[in-house]
Regions:
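Core, highly hydrophobic multi-pass alpha-helical transmembrane subunits of bioenergetic inner membranes
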Residues: 1-331
């Protein structure tokens, strides 16, 4: 049952993102960020989750620090040309949880429920990414390259020894942030495409985990799944998130690979590709542990709403396969 208060705060959260998206000045964009922050704190807070107070306090302190850096850098525009851009860029990286200022992101994710994790991994990244795309200069490009490389390495290596699914998804989000930062370097439409696909795939995994109430690696044993079909959809979703062809998650990565190759950014591309292979390894570790255990001999029927959700997730991940088939059919 949805809480009416949380629904109201969710709409104001979306409003804050839209204000940042449509703003014509840094001050208005900052106001949108603050409205977004103040709306998300009540959504995190829950009397049914003992860790929500800690997560909301951590999130508030980090976001307040990022906002303070943005405000303090404003007077520097009168004295310096490049320093304010660097400070704003660093503050935005802090707000979105990109490396090397990612330290808060996994612990905050761990203290949330799955629906709140979806918002943190997707909607909460839109406004900082938009503002980051406006800070174009040679110095900020160097910082974005460093943040992208650090996010790819930390997001891939740190996820290897995790046993909590939410932490695995958190480090996966940090790794995907590296690809989005590279896409920002290319053009605005590229990172929006990547972000849209990432949001669809990561949200589908979080919805499956929420429907099965899975939070720990050990819970992925097959008796936690109501039907064997959910196991296969979970496998496909994780492989799609890892960017394995022919699933949906491969398309934006392929576009970024092509553009980085055309721009002769081979070092950047090599770091991203190696990290993508490492993340794919721990996705496979999660999914293989799910598939290798036998299913229970219990007859379980899913409600029609769950069947619709699972069918939608399956179609989304297999969408790239349908494109050439439809083109062949209509030509």
């Amino acid at each position: 049952m949805l809480n009416p208060t949380q629904v109201l705060f969710f709409f104001t959260l979306i409003l804050g993102t839209l204000i940042t998206f449509s703003s014509s000045s840094w001050f208005t964009a900052w106001l949108g960020l603050e409205l977004n922050l103040l709306s998300f704190i009540p959504i995190i807070s829950s009397k049914f989750n003992q860790y929500s107070a800690e997560a909301s306090l951590k999130y508030f302190l980090i976001q307040a620090l990022g906002s303070a850096i943005i405000l303090s850098s404003a007077p520097s525009f009168l004295l310096f040309e490049s320093s304010p851009n660097l400070l704003i860029c660093l503050a935005l990286l802090l707000k979105m949880g990109a490396a090397p200022v990612h330290f808060w992101f996994p612990s905050v994710m761990e203290g949330m429920n799955w629906p709140q994790c979806i918002i943190l991994m997707t909607i909460q990244k839109i406004a900082p990414m938009l503002m980051l795309s406006y800070t174009h200069s040679p110095l900020t490009l160097s910082l974005i390259f460093f943040a992208s490389a650090a996010s790819s390495v930390i997001g891939s290596v740190s996820g290897l020894n995790q046993t909590l699914i939410r932490k695995i998804m958190a480090y996966s989000s940090i790794n995907h942030m590296a690809w989005m930062l590279a896409a920002i370097h290319i053009n605005e439409m590229m990172w929006m495409t990547y972000f849209l696909v990432y949001s669809l795939v990561s949200s589908s995994i979080a919805l499956i985990m929420h429907s099965q109430q899975i939070f720990h690696f050990n819970q992925l044993s097959s008796h936690n799944f109501k039907t064997p079909g959910i196991k296969m959809i979970t496998l496909i979703s994780f492989l799609s998130l890892g960017g394995l062809p022919p699933f949906l998650g491969f398309i934006p990565k392929w576009l970024v690979i092509q553009e980085l190759s055309n721009n002769k950014a081979f070092i950047w591309l090599s770091i991203l590709l190696i990290s993508a292979l490492i993340t794919l390894f721990y996705y496979l570790r999660v999914t293989l542990s799910t598939l290798t255990l036998s299913s229970p001999k219990i007859k379980n029927t899913l409600p029609s709403s769950s069947k619709t959700l699972l069918s939608s997730i399956l179609f989304i991940n297999f969408f790239p396969i349908f494109i050439p088939l439809s083109l062949t059919f209509f030509t």
